[in-house]
Amino acid sequence: MNKILIAAASSGTGKTTVTLGIMHALKKRGLRVQPFKVGPDYIDTNYHQAITGVASINLDSFLIDDDAMLAALFEKHGQSADISVIEGVMGLFDGLGIDRDNSSTSFIAKCTKTPVILVVDGKAISTSAAAIVDGFNRFDPELTIAGVIINRVASENHFSLIKGAIERYTDVPVLGYLPKNAAVALPERHLGLVPKEEMTELETKWEVLGDLIAEHVDLDRLLAISKTGAKLTVHPPEIQVPDFSGMRVAYALDAAFHFYYQDNLDFIRSTGATLIPFSPLEEREVPDADFIYIGGGFPEVFAERLAKNKSMHESILAAHEQGKPIYAECGGLMYLGSSLEMEAESYEMVGVFDGVSKMTTRLRKFGYCIAEPLEDTLLGKKGTAIRGHEFHHSVFETTEPTRMKLTKKRDGETVKEWHGGYQKGNTFASYLHIHFYQNLAMITHMFGAIER
């Protein structure tokens, strides 16, 4: 399998921009590109899919605490592609705590045996770039930097200085650069990049970006590097796929709700269940289904439109009152509350839970955690350890009883504990995002609620 991993020295270096440009340039050459993203991010994967036409897959060694399973998923998705391109997260060695192998990009590179291309920010730097590359190349004896791409380069002369320094003081080849160009900048807001669903003229941006990469990066050399990764010897755990043939699962999918891991959706399909997308923004009612799944997204951006769609509120409430299982994550929790408040405005939501979501100006929760149900819930049985992550600016103010204890640990130490998660009847909602492949029995438990 041909494969490369695009990493960086830190967040904000332009890793995503360079990755998207490479994906576009490779696709323009006629190659089938399979995209991957290290970590739990949903927005970057949507960009990947927009460019390649192929669903991007998250590789997260915290959410899936099984190296063999991660490697098997990587192999499965990449086997039919001409090249697999993995976008890293944060800095190459950044993860959970100070262990360079704990939930980091470098760990995924080693787990998948993928050559690393390091993106270095060229803004206001020249010879010092060589020190960065040399330090990263020496830091982990089990990992070698196979090439470097310089981002935000001011001129050809500027690039020559950086390239000359790196190749004089290190043995890492410089594959090229991306010049400074405001036309390819990706807009950001409170949860990172603005989702593709809310942007216009993306095709033009991708064309410009891909052409810049094709002009200034040695893609032939990059493709040669992609062939140097060792072959994976995969021994995945045996997977018992439950049979839910005939089951209908309605899941919210539109500009307001689109945070889903592709592997989660694929596994639901593998059970024989039928996935039926619906739009809380556009449609009047939930499709006829046995189970309702409302993922995360940006309900706050579309609060007015969501509030006006009263018939959808009534349809979801009716499903809840009939005892149909409803599972909601983050933005889904906000939607199932009684209202959403921001900027002195209040917007009526579905009202399954008596609670108000309030937008704030800072991150309220950020990062990985372990959830433990305090009683049997739709998400899991009492005492089950459930891996997940939270990332939100809102708070949910409610008198509803919490159903989970959540713990954040770092380097073996507990750094934070809190409670969350709400269940009423067969409806469960929390800020937690989860990956089913941590424990595939979760689906059997959740779908089993239809019969309970």
Swiss-Prot record:
Site feature (Increases nucleophilicity of active site Cys) residues? 433
GO molecular function terms here? ATP binding; cobyrinic acid a,c-diamide synthase activity
Q: Give the record's pathway.
A: Cofactor biosynthesis; adenosylcobalamin biosynthesis; cob(II)yrinate a,c-diamide from sirohydrochlorin (anaerobic route): step 10/10
Q: Which PROSITE patterns match?
A: GATASE_COBBQ
Which UniProt keywords are given for this protein, alphabetically ordered?
Answer: ATP-binding, Cobalamin biosynthesis, Glutamine amidotransferase, Ligase, Magnesium, Nucleotide-binding
The catalytic site is made up of 330
Q: Which cofactor does it need?
A: Mg(2+)
Reaction equations catalysed = cob(II)yrinate + 2 L-glutamine + 2 ATP + 2 H2O = cob(II)yrinate a,c diamide + 2 L-glutamate + 2 ADP + 2 phosphate + 2 H(+)
Q: Name one GO biological process term.
A: cobalamin biosynthetic process
What InterPro entries does UniProt report for this protein, alphabetically? CbiA/CobB_synth, Class_I_gatase-like, CobQ/CobB/MinD/ParA_Nub-bd_dom, GATase_3, P-loop_NTPase
GATase cobBQ-type domain residues: 248-441
The top EC class is ligase
Q: Which cysteines are joined by disulfide bonds?
A: none
Q: Name the domain of life.
A: Bacteria
Q: What Pfam families does the database record attribute to this sequence?
A: CbiA, GATase_3
Further information = The a and c carboxylates of cobyrinate are activated for nucleophilic attack via formation of a phosphorylated intermediate by ATP. CbiA catalyzes first the amidation of the c-carboxylate, and then that of the a-carboxylate.
Family statement drawn from the similarity comment of this UniProt entry: Belongs to the CobB/CbiA family.
NCBIfam families (UniProt xref): cobB, PRK01077.1
Q: How are the domains described in the entry?
A: Comprises of two domains. The C-terminal domain contains the binding site for glutamine and catalyzes the hydrolysis of this substrate to glutamate and ammonia. The N-terminal domain is anticipated to bind ATP and cobyrinate and catalyzes the ultimate synthesis of the diamide product. The ammonia produced via the glutaminase domain is probably translocated to the adjacent domain via a molecular tunnel, where it reacts with an activated intermediate.
What does the UniProt function comment say about this protein? Catalyzes the ATP-dependent amidation of the two carboxylate groups at positions a and c of cobyrinate, using either L-glutamine or ammonia as the nitrogen source.
Identify this protein by name: Cobyrinate a,c-diamide synthase
Q: Which organism is it from?
A: Listeria monocytogenes serovar 1/2a (strain ATCC BAA-679 / EGD-e)
The lineage, from the top, is: Bacteria, Bacillati, Bacillota, Bacilli, Bacillales
